[in-house]
Design a protein with these regions (language model features):
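Bulky hydrophobic/aromatic content
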Residues: 1-53
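Loop-centered beta-sheet repeat module
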Residues: 39-86, 91-93
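Residue-level signal for tight coil/turn positions that link beta-strands
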Residues: 66, 73, 97, 169-171, ...
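Flexible linker/loop signature enriched in Pro/Ser/Thr and Pro/Gly
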Residues: 84-123
Length: 221
């Protein structure tokens, strides 16, 4: 952990009587029981049988070839190749650990990401998105955002995404280069009226619908 790294760097071995680092907690810790097992499965290239329960659907059972663990917004996700049976093609999926209801070892040969998805660099799978939702039929595009001056100072020092760049000839404007997805919408709506999406029009249209829906819930109440 980073605490162990700091202790090693500063040669510290001190029995603390009070906390000196505070981590943002997460009330939903059910997924923790699977973290270590999946981490070892990735290192050892071992398949798992995962019972996965989407919020609005029945349990699905996958043969999983685990490739990568990712944390986003206080949730853990597994990027893996999945099969419904040993005879079906491998499909890439991102599964939230807190929707896993059961997991077993399974004696199925592990198929590496390089073999299953030769055109995909798994380490870069999430590179062009915010969050974990990637849609192969959606293009990566520029997102132009105008910020209030005060919010611009905050966003310029705490980027929304690694692709974020300032626009030299447009004060208080930034540019992202990402794929549109639900997490992008969530992240931008977080800033409320402190920002305006200038481009693309598709996001402006989406936000207009969201805001109209919000207004209908609060209007005359």
């Amino acid at each position: 952990s980073i605490i162990k790294q700091l202790e090693k760097k500063h040669q510290m071995d001190i029995p603390y009587t009070q906390a000196v680092v505070h981590f943002e907690g997460n009330a939903n810790i059910d997924c923790n029981q699977y973290l270590a097992s999946l981490y070892e499965a990735i290192l050892n290239q071992q398949c798992k049988q995962i019972y996965y329960k989407p919020f609005t659907k029945s349990v699905r059972v996958y043969i999983a070839h685990p490739y990568l663990l990712k944390e986003y917004n206080q949730r853990w996700y597994l990027l893996c190749g999945t099969q419904e049976s040993v005879d079906t093609p491998i499909k890439i999926r991102t599964l939230p650990l807190d929707r896993m209801v059961k997991m077993n070892d399974i004696p199925v040969p592990f198929v590496s990401s390089q073999t299953a998805f030769p055109d995909e660099e798994i380490g870069d799978y999430f590179h062009n998105i915010i969050g974990v939702t990637r849609k192969d039929n959606h293009p990566i595009q520029d997102i132009i955002i105008k910020c209030d001056p005060k919010e611009f100072m905050y966003i310029s020092t705490k980027p929304i995404h690694p692709s974020q760049r300032l626009i030299p000839d447009k004060p208080n404007h930034i540019k992202l280069r990402v794929q549109e997805n639900y997490e992008l919408y969530q992240r931008l709506l977080f800033y409320g009226d402190k920002i305006e999406v200038i481009y693309p029009q598709s996001i402006r249209d989406e936000f207009r619908k969201v805001l109209q829906g919000m207004l209908s819930k609060y209007h005359n109440k």
